[in-house]
Amino acid sequence: MASAAEQMAANLSWGALGKATELRQRIWFTLGLLIIYRLGTYIPVPGIDGASLRNFMDQAQSGIGGILSMFTGGALGRMGVFALGIMPYISASIIVQLMASMVPALEQLKKEGETGRKKINQYTRYGTVALALFQAWGLAVSLEHGNLAHEPGMFFRASVVITLVGGTMFLMWLGEQITARGIGNGISLIIFVGIVAEIPGHLAQFLAQGRSGAISTPVILGVIVMVAAVIGFVVFMERALRKIHIQYPRRQVGMKIYDGQSSHLPIKVNPAGVIPAIFASSLLLLPVTISTFSGNQTGPVMSTVLAYFGPGQPLYLLFFAAMIVFFTYFYTFNVSFKTEDVAENLKNQGGFIPGIRPGKRTEDYLTYVVTRVLVIGSAYLAFVCLLPEIIRDQLAIPFYFGGTSVLIVVSVVMDTINQVQSHLLAHQYEGLIEKSQLRGKRGKTGTAKPRKAPARR
C-alpha cells in the first residue's frame, strides 16, 4: 500500500508551479545565471586572430576540436573568456577526491561534517586556480605557435592567462550560486547548457551533409534511431534499482508496542551518475588540448600522444572505457554510496537485513551486492559512451557527437525534474499544514462555551 507521500507525489500537478513562489524565484534565478554564462561564451579573449581560429576549428571539428567545443558550449571555438569551461574545476575535484582516499589528513576532514566539507571545497578551489593557470598558459603558448595571435609576446600570454583563469573562476562561482539558490546542480547545468547550445548547429550541419549527398539517407535515419534508442536506454538504466529488504524490530514507546516495520534500501544500477563519464572525458582532454592548438609545432612526444589517443583510436577507446570503469567504482564506494556509513546508519536506527548481522557483516554484504551491481552499471556507462564514438568513426560523420553528451543531457534533465517535483511536494505539504492549523483554530472557536449573561436583580 502506497504511503501518503507517494500518493501525493503521484497526484502532483504541475499547475501548482504557479503557486510555488519560492520555486519560481529559484527557476528564474537559475535561468538568469545560465543566460549570463551563454553571453560570456561570445566575449572574445583579446589579441586572437578570429579568421585563423575559425579555419583551425573547422578543420578540427570532427575530432578533438569538436569535443572541446561541445564541453565548453562553443566558447573554445570562439576563444571566449569561458574557453577553459568548467573542466579545471572538475579535474581539481578528481585530484582532491583521489587524495582524500589516500591521505589520512584529508580522510579525517571528510569525517568532520560540514566544517571538513568546507575545507575540502576550499582545497578544490585552490586546485582549480592552479590547473586553470597551467592550462591557460599552455593554451596561450599554443596559440602563438599556431599563428593564431595578432601580436605574440609576454603581454599576450599574460592577458590570455588572466582572462581565462578569471572566466573559469567566475563559472565556478556561477555553479555554486545555482546549486545554493537555484534549481539543480550548478556545475552539471553549466555543462548541460553548453552541450544543448551546440546541438542545433551540429544538427543543421548533419542534415546539410545529407542534402548534399555526402551522407546517405539510410545513415541519417540510422543515426537518428540510434540516438533515440540510446536516450531511452539511458532513461531506463538511470531508473533501474536493486532493492535490499530492511527489517526493523518491534519497539515499545511508553505503554504502547509498535509492530516491526519493513522497508527497502534502493541501490541504483548506476549510483555514480554522470560523474565517471565527465571525469574520464576531462582527463582525456587534458593532455591533448595543448598539443592540438600547437599545430605542427608539437614535439615528438605530443605528436605520438595525439596520434594514439585521438578520438576514435583503439587506445583512446580502451583508455576511455578503463577510466569509466575505474571512476564508477571509485566514486561509488568513496562518495555516493559508502557501505561503511550505510551499515552504521542502519545499525543506529535499529534496522537490519534479514539473515545478516548488523555491523561488519552488513557492510561486507552491501559491498558484495554493490560490487556486482556496478559490473552492470560500469558496462552500461562504457557502452553508452563508446558506441557513438565507434559509429562516428566507422561512418566518417564530419562532426562530434558522443555518448557522454547524451548521458549528461538525460541525467541532468532527470535530476532537475526530480528537484522541481521535490520543491512542489514540499510546497504542497506546507499548504496542507497551514489548512490543518486554520481548521484547528476554527474548531476551537466553534466549540468555545458562550459567556453567561449577568443575572437580573
Which positions does each model-derived feature cover?
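N-terminal cationic and glycine-rich segments that engage phosphates or anionic surfaces
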Residues: M1-K110, T115-R457
